């Protein structure tokens, strides 16, 4: 283990510092500054190398966290990245974007602040790229089998890389003009700059993975054509159908889904031309939804120069500390101050949106009421209505499932009652040879779950093609996080 008394010597949890707010809202660069090596080493040394490391079960990938904490404490960065890559294809994604359920399961977190696992993880991969320790791993021989992966988000990329490395010829189909899916166009650069995606794609190309951009499966090429052309097809199209709010005034000009705001904004940052971009400069903005997507809209609006930004959440403000009904090692719901919240804006809880109001077809405000709980339901309380002035509203209410994209009509793939592509215990749909991984089959979830499912689905595909597999399968389709709502 690392320092046997490290958790006693260093009791303070010291996370990665953020750049000053007045500086960072003037650009789109990542908000975090580098952490000093000595601080990082001390934080890694707080790991107790538990006999039963609950951080493993908290992470869907089963990351070998105590092992690479120990290696960082011993200044063995090259060995650390080998242990990290053994379970995680893309630690630069999870190290920046994951809410770190592993830290919620850290044994030290029972009576001290948890180990800064996420920060150690991202430092390992950043150091590895800087020192040239990340290299292509092409297969020694080809199997002669072909696989099409549809969608280039975290699940699709993980599945493609795993299948390529065991010798299958893999082609990734992406309807957008660049690879990355959610990572490319859904996540603002201030959370993760896109060079992180680009260099992984280059690694995958050197390993032999092929990429087909600008191809919409279901229209440009049918699912049936893919199934005939390839020995297996993996559906990794994500859960992209946004949850709507069908209340009076929904059709007013100025009410938009969050992704209709974020995707063009990310394209502009990438230097791509965008027509009729939704821009928040000088506008009064209201965001409905208090999750990560809402925070992404908030940070983007700050950088656009919004006059004001208010986030409305229908539920109660979460507690600052773990509630009694969410005991360790479950993943708790906590009040958090993301970088975007630190930059400004107001957050209002127990706010039920009842109507979008406007004049001449344009949004002028949002009518809200206080939320009351009746028979377990959240309802607007009569007599508490008020109108908040607004020029723009962004609906960041989550996603309800995968887009059909012709998959039912063309290959008879079925959907479950939650809007996800149905699959069996081996990630296969009801159509033989067509598999599904990530949010398309699981529903809206975390990037770390998408990568884990991509890896596990790759193992299932490899076994389907070859009769056996050496690929790891960290999760089953029915696995869920340990949580109490």
List the predicted regions and their residue ranges:
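Beta1-alpha1 glycine-rich phosphate/pyrophosphate-binding loop at the start
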Residues: 5-33, 62-74, 79-84, 88, ...
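A short, basic/flexible loop-to-alpha-helix module at the beginning of a structural domain
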Residues: 31, 128-147, 263-283
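Feature captures the FAD/FMN-dependent oxidoreductase FAD-binding
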Residues: 79, 141, 146-150, 198-247, ...
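A conserved FAD-binding loop/helix module that cradles the flavin
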Residues: 294-299, 304, 440-468
